[in-house]
């Protein structure tokens, strides 16, 4: 029993250490670093998320009705890259992020999520720019790129390589385990609650569908996302509007409570925390249209392989 008790105490101490570190990073350092970086990019890029918004909408809707070329190892079209990036942003995380923000900081936390998202648009613009600029084209025409590539370019010595490796390991863990697990669990819970289908069955079906897509490589991923994402986004927006309209009599009160509560200390904390939760959870086939994973380093991989004559062509879509 002594050995078991010591092992249990050790695990509890380790868990407390993780919670302490996570609390410091999520509640203090990371939140303000992300907003600070976004603010810096916003100022230095001349409020690009405002200046380029009209062009982004024009090119996005134009791309929805324009036939894209076949994606392959040499890359994908601008719209396919955008759809792939959005598919990595829309989903469970947005709902959980907003709910967590409200629970922690009250209605005012939503305002700070808006602020985080606004400045995050400039951060994503910078991420996509660097991904396009520092992407690599192999002798066989294969295109690769992403944060690991521009991290190495920023630090051309051995330190850059070490940072790139660390980033690659961490992003693999975040995207390959945490994000996918949350999405699959949400799907399984929904089917269990609505249709009483065992989670194991749902898990097997989800895994089979994912395998089918992955086996097809970048071509199948791009082809699927460019078809599904517009429909998914439409359902997301229409569903949100239906909820708002159905509760229209409370809209004025809700908006007022958001702005009134926005400048309470607990609201500021809650908004940042909810935003981080939203980014952490939003990985999988579908994620949140209004949560952008700014600074996480996930979406640049999609933008890096866009086949464009000039990086500006892809960057004009980023604000969506």
Predicted regions and their residues:
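Hydrophobic, membrane-embedded alpha-helices of multi-pass small-molecule transporters
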Residues: 29-37, 77-93, 163-184, 198, ...
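Membrane-interface loop-to-helix entry segments
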Residues: 34-40, 45-57, 167, 184-191, ...
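Juxtamembrane helix-boundary/capping and inter-helix hinge elements in multi-pass membrane proteins
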Residues: 101-109, 135-145, 156-158, 294, ...
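N-terminal alpha-helical transmembrane segments of multi-pass membrane transport
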Residues: 11-92, 103-109, 120
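Helix-loop-helix module between adjacent transmembrane segments
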Residues: 41-42, 116-141, 152-185, 189-213
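Juxtamembrane inter-helical linkers in multi-pass membrane proteins
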Residues: 56-68, 136-154, 258-263
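Short, Lys/Arg-enriched N-terminal segments with co-localized hydrophobic residues
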Residues: 1-11
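Conserved small/polar residues in nucleotide/adenosyl-binding loops
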Residues: 318-320
